[in-house]
């Protein structure tokens, strides 16, 4: 009897979850069925995939986005970086048509996202941090259910091969690992053959090998003309994938360009990092002759220098003179992460 009661309880939970999923799809269908507004009544062909001019959005007294402007070309991977509260999510939600702006001009695929209707929504894909799918459905059932929201769609077989889950097609979502569930989210984002794909932390939960395979998928999509807007906290991911990027902080853009140009803005500096066993009065003898700027926390020191050979010789000579071992000594070129942390702070 207890087992029967549990089975009935599981059945009720399953039906509730399935009901929530169907209601979610009904909302999607309702959005897609909304009339297309604008003079042409359809999404036109444009040379720029996304244009944003002087975009602003406030929540009460909080200015979440303050006069942001940028553009994205077709087939480009465009990354939006920044700490929590920088305005990234609000900006992306406005681009997706899920939030109204207070002022400024926004064009995605030639239309205002809030007025694009079904023609617009059939041309974008969205991979949220959490898709909220019914985990009691199988992968096949989930893809089949969500594909009905799109008028032009890839086959389930094609999509499942793209995300490398062919052997899990008839597995329940609940039985997949976190990384595999994230790949299902990615499959849902591309099943509608989007012209613009929004990726919000797409590789969270992936192991390093799976993350790199997903990068190849993103490159393939972009290479075939899909415009991709990427938000990620993995700076290596942005450096690897982005053609152009912006860094936001406090609702404004604090840096913009290619990953290479942002590194160049930091100069040709080399980063020397190491840890001291202790900090004492003799430290001045280490830092004073250096050509670069020093920063640190606790025992960790970081030297940003344009003369790495001379400074490294001085640092190691000082350490030998004092009989000190420099733990974790490394010499590295400036990375996008270094530039990012200088822009937004190490506590972000």
Identify the meaning behind each predicted range:
Residues 15, 21-56, 346-348:
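ABC-family P-loop ATPase nucleotide-binding domain
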Residues 48-50, 57-249, 255:
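ABC transporter nucleotide-binding domains
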Residues 2-3, 9, 13, 19-21:
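Short linear motifs in low-complexity or flexible loops
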Residues 216-306:
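ABC transporter nucleotide-binding domain
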Residues 13-15, 31, 232, 290, ...:
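Intrinsically disordered, low-complexity cationic segments
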Residues 25, 38-40, 308-348:
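C-terminal coupling/interaction segments
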Residues 125, 147, 151, 246, ...:
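A generic structural signal for secondary-structure junctions
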